[in-house]
């Protein structure tokens, strides 16, 4: 597993910052705050979830299930899109509380747009992963554990971002309540240099496997294909359409 911070655009060295624009302007405001108690969190919509990211020969494939639950006991929504585009060639999954994940995605999108406006070029995946880790560690986003996937000049990247802000890059990764079930299939099916089409089938099968036994996952699959040309996201309630 590889940590993205080394030599990233967000490494704080004197040489890097000397000729760069002031990183604190323009300001986007302070982080949102919350005053929820532990009891309140039982009534928060959560995604439960199985989310998967796979690097491929063509780019990256991300897959998620579609279920949201209330307190882990009641299915509150059967059509949740748990992967969102946050970069011209990058996407992030939603894991944890729905509100926290949506706020997290909105904050990252704002920073991505500001970076491009200041520098005239898209932010690299390593820098975006470092920024996402900083947000997860310092912001009030509850227990989120998203996957970031994207393509840049260095190639294809998949990162898992833990609730404490830890960032790890790997060829494939899984997060969420169904991760053990999905990992079992991925360990058998993953091969280097899979095409996007092949990885899509593998990822959908892994989501289906998790949905069979994990009560927090189910109701279909959203598939996200990322290449150097952009991001394509599509949902399927019937697993047979994609496996």
From Swiss-Prot:
InterPro entries: Ntn_hydrolases_N, Pept_T1A_Psome_bsu_arc, Pept_T1A_subB, Proteasome_sua/b, Proteasome_suB-type. It is found in: Cytoplasm. It holds the Pfam family Proteasome. Transmembrane segments: none annotated. Residues 1-16 have a biased composition (Polar residues). Residues 1-29 are annotated as: Disordered. It comes from the Archaea. It catalyses: Cleavage of peptide bonds with very broad specificity. One of its GO terms (molecular function) is threonine-type endopeptidase activity. It is an enzyme of class 3 (hydrolase). The keyword Cytoplasm applies. The keyword Signal does not apply. GO terms for cellular component: cytoplasm; proteasome core complex, beta-subunit complex. Its main location: cytoplasm. Residues 1-48 form a propeptide. One of its GO terms (biological process) is proteasomal protein catabolic process. The active site is at residue 49. Keywords: Autocatalytic cleavage, Cytoplasm, Hydrolase, Protease, Proteasome, Threonine protease, Zymogen. Its EC number is 3.4.25.1. The formation of the proteasomal ATPase PAN-20S proteasome complex, via the docking of the C-termini of PAN into the intersubunit pockets in the alpha-rings, triggers opening of the gate for substrate entry. Interconversion between the open-gate and close-gate conformations leads to a dynamic regulation of the 20S proteasome proteolysis activity. Belongs to the peptidase T1B family. Component of the proteasome core, a large protease complex with broad specificity involved in protein degradation. The 20S proteasome core is composed of 14 alpha and 14 beta subunits that assemble into four stacked heptameric rings, resulting in a barrel-shaped structure. The two inner rings, each composed of seven catalytic beta subunits, are sandwiched by two outer rings, each composed of seven alpha subunits. The catalytic chamber with the active sites is on the inside of the barrel. Has a gated structure, the ends of the cylinder being occluded by the N-termini of the alpha-subunits. Is capped at one or both ends by the proteasome regulatory ATPase, PAN. PANTHER family: ATP-DEPENDENT PROTEASE SUBUNIT HSLV, METALLOPROTEASE TLDD. This is Proteasome subunit beta. It comes from Natrialba magadii (strain ATCC 43099 / DSM 3394 / CCM 3739 / CIP 104546 / IAM 13178 / JCM 8861 / NBRC 102185 / NCIMB 2190 / MS3) (Natronobacterium magadii).
């Amino acid at each position: 597993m590889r940590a993205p911070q080394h030599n990233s655009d967000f490494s704080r060295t004197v040489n890097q910052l000397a000729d760069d624009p002031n990183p604190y302007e323009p300001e986007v405001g302070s982080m949102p705050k919350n005053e929820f108690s532990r009891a309140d969190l039982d009534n928060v919509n959560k995604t439960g979830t199985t989310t998967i990211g796979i690097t491929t020969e063509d780019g990256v494939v991300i897959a998620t299930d579609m279920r949201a639950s209330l307190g882990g006991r009641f299915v509150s929504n059967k059509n949740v899109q748990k992967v969102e585009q946050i970069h011209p060639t990058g996407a992030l999954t939603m894991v944890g509380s729905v509100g926290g994940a949506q706020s997290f995605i909105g904050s990252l999108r704002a920073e991505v747009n500001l970076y491009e406006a200041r520098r005239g070029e898209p932010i690299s995946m390593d820098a975006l992963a470092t920024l996402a880790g900083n947000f997860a560690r310092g912001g009030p986003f509850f227990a989120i554990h998203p996957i970031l996937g994207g393509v840049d000049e260095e190639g294809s990247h998949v990162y898992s971002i833990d609730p404490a802000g830890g960032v790890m890059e790997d060829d494939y990764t899984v997060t969420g309540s169904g991760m053990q079930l999905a990992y079992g299939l991925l360990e058998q099916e993953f091969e280097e240099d899979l095409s996007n089409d092949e990885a899509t089938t593998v990822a959908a099968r892994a989501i289906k496997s998790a949905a069979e036994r994990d009560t927090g996952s189910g109701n279909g699959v959203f598939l996200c294909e990322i290449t150097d040309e952009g991001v394509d996201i599509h949902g399927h309630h019937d697993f047979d359409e994609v496996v």
